[in-house]
Swiss-Prot record:
<dbReference type="GO" id="GO:0000398">
    <property type="term" value="P:mRNA splicing, via spliceosome"/>
</dbReference>
<keyword id="KW-0747">Spliceosome</keyword>
<feature type="modified residue" description="Phosphoserine">
    <location>
        <position position="266"/>
    </location>
</feature>
<dbReference type="InterPro" id="IPR019339">
    <property type="entry name" value="CIR_N_dom"/>
</dbReference>
<keyword id="KW-0175">Coiled coil</keyword>
<feature type="compositionally biased region" description="Basic and acidic residues">
    <location>
        <begin position="179"/>
        <end position="199"/>
    </location>
</feature>
<dbReference type="GO" id="GO:0045292">
    <property type="term" value="P:mRNA cis splicing, via spliceosome"/>
</dbReference>
<feature type="modified residue" description="Phosphoserine">
    <location>
        <position position="268"/>
    </location>
</feature>
<comment type="function">
    <text>Involved in mRNA splicing.</text>
</comment>
<feature type="coiled-coil region">
    <location>
        <begin position="25"/>
        <end position="60"/>
    </location>
</feature>
<keyword id="KW-0507">mRNA processing</keyword>
<dbReference type="GO" id="GO:0000974">
    <property type="term" value="C:Prp19 complex"/>
</dbReference>
<feature type="region of interest" description="Disordered">
    <location>
        <begin position="153"/>
        <end position="211"/>
    </location>
</feature>
<dbReference type="InterPro" id="IPR022209">
    <property type="entry name" value="CWC25"/>
</dbReference>
<comment type="similarity">
    <text>Belongs to the CWC25 family.</text>
</comment>
<feature type="region of interest" description="Disordered">
    <location>
        <begin position="258"/>
        <end position="289"/>
    </location>
</feature>
<keyword id="KW-0539">Nucleus</keyword>
Length: 376
C-alpha cells in the first residue's frame, strides 16, 4: 500500500495542474502587455515622423499649422435651454430674425436676474439663520463665559498688583515719615535736655545769688543791730572821731566810707568756691567718663593681645608635637625596614603568618627549621 509521491500533495509543487494554469495565465498576460507596449511605441514613432514631416513642409515654405486642442474650443449651449444647434443653423441660414434673438436674449437676462435675486434672498435668510444658530449655540455661550471669567481674573490680578505697589509706596512713605519724626523728636529731646540743663544751671545760679543776697542782707541787718546795740556804736564813734582827726578834709572821709561799703558788699570767698564747684560739677563726669572708656579700651586691647599670643603659642606647640610624631613614625619605619631587609608590608605579614601563625603546627615549624639547618 503505497502512498505515492508526497511532494505532489504540496501546494507549491510545479506539477500540480492549478500551478501550471497559473503560470500559463501569467505568461499570456505578459504577452498581451508586450503587444500593447509595442503598439504604443509604433504610434509614438508615427506621430514623431508626422511632426517631422510637418516641420519640413513649413521649412520648405508651406502653410504653418496651428497646434491646438480642438475640444477646448468647442462652444457649449450657453444661450438658454431652448437654444440648440438647429436654432443656430436656422439663424445662420436666414430663417430666424435678429430681433427675435435679441428678445430671447433679454428674456434670458431677466430670468437670470430673478434667479440671482432669489439666490440673494436665500443668502440673507441663511445669514439670519446662521446668526440665530450662533446665538443659540451652547458651545459659543460656554466660550464667551470662559472669556469673561478670564478677563475678570486678569482684572483682579492687575488690581492686586496695583494695590501691592501702592501699599509698598505707602509703607516706604510711612517709614520715611517715621524716621523723620524720630530724628525730629530726638533733636527736640536733645534741645529740650540742653534747654533744661541750661535752665537748671540758671535756676541754680539764681538761687545761689538770692541766697547770697539774703545772707548779705541778714549780715547787714545784723551789723546794723550790733551797731544799734551800743558797742559798735561806741567804737564806730571812736573810729569816726579818729578818722575825722586823721583825714584832713571831708572828701577823704567820704572816699573812705564808700570803699568800706564796697568791700562789705563783695561776695565772700566761700560763695566763690561753691560757685566754682557748681560750674565744674557738670564737666567733671564727662572727663571721668572719657577716662573710663579709654581705660576699658586699653584693657580690651591688652586682653586681645594676650589671647593672640596664647593662641600662637598653642599652635607652635601642636606643630612641634606633630613634627615629633612624624619623626618618630619615620624612624620606626626605617628600623622595621632595616630589620626585614627592606621588604614590603605584605611580604612581612605573609612571612609572619607562615612562620608564626595559628595555621602552622609545631611539626611544620620543626621540619622547616631542620630543613634550614641542613641547607649548605
Amino acid at each position: 500500500m503505497g502512498g505515492g509521491d508526497l511532494n505532489m500533495k504540496k501546494s507549491w509543487h510545479p506539477l500540480l495542474m492549478r500551478n501550471q494554469e497559473k503560470v500559463w495565465k501569467d505568461e499570456q498576460a505578459h504577452k498581451e502587455e508586450m503587444k500593447r507596449v509595442e503598439q504604443l511605441r509604433r504610434e509614438i514613432e508615427e506621430e514623431r515622423q508626422l511632426l517631422e514631416l510637418h516641420r519640413l513642409q513649413e521649412a520648405a515654405g508651406g502653410k504653418k499649422r496651428k497646434d491646438r486642442v480642438e475640444w477646448m474650443y468647442a462652444v457649449p449651449n450657453t444661450n438658454g435651454p431652448n437654444r440648440d444647434s438647429s436654432e443656430m443653423e436656422e439663424y445662420l441660414l436666414g430663417r430666424r430674425r435678429l430681433d427675435d434673438l435679441l428678445k430671447d436674449k433679454i428674456e434670458d437676462q431677466n430670468n437670470s436676474l430673478e434667479k440671482t435675486e432669489f439666490i440673494a434672498l436665500q443668502n440673507a435668510n441663511s445669514l439670519q439663520d446662521t446668526q440665530a444658530k450662533l446665538r443659540l449655540d451652547p458651545l459659543l455661550a460656554i466660550k464667551q463665559q470662559e472669556q469673561k471669567q478670564l478677563q475678570t481674573l486678569m482684572e483682579k490680578r492687575k488690581y492686586s498688583l496695583d494695590s501691592d505697589r501702592k501699599s509698598k509706596e505707602r509703607r516706604h512713605r510711612d517709614r520715611h515719615h517715621r524716621s523723620n519724626q524720630d530724628r525730629s523728636r530726638e533733636r527736640s529731646d536733645n534741645e529740650q535736655h540742653s534747654s533744661d540743663k541750661r535752665e537748671h544751671s540758671r535756676r541754680s545760679y539764681r538761687n545761689d545769688r538770692n541766697n547770697w543776697r539774703e545772707r548779705t542782707h541778714n549780715d547787714r541787718y545784723r551789723h546794723r543791730d550790733k551797731y544799734d546795740s551800743g558797742y559798735f556804736k561806741k567804737h564806730y564813734d571812736d573810729d569816726m572821731r579818729f578818722d575825722q582827726g586823721h583825714f584832713q578834709d571831708e572828701r577823704d572821709l567820704k572816699k573812705y566810707v564808700r570803699t568800706s561799703r564796697q568791700y562789705s558788699r563783695s561776695p565772700s570767698p566761700d560763695f566763690r568756691t561753691r560757685n566754682h564747684q557748681f560750674h565744674s560739677r557738670d564737666s567733671q563726669p564727662i572727663t571721668q567718663r572719657h577716662t573710663d572708656i579709654e581705660s576699658r579700651l586699653q584693657k580690651m586691647q591688652d586682653n586681645a593681645k594676650e589671647l593672640d599670643e596664647s593662641r600662637r603659642k598653642k599652635i607652635e606647640l601642636l606643630e612641634k608635637k606633630e613634627r615629633d610624631e612624624e619623626q618618630f613614625l619615620e624612624k620606626e619605619r626605617r628600623d622595621t625596614a632595616r630589620k626585614w631587609d627592606n621588604q614590603g608590608d605584605f611580604i612581612r605579614n605573609m612571612r609572619k603568618e607562615i612562620y608564626s601563625g595559628d595555621s602552622v603546627s609545631l611539626a611544620d615549624r620543626v621540619n622547616s627549621s631542620r630543613h634550614n639547618m641542613l641547607r649548605p
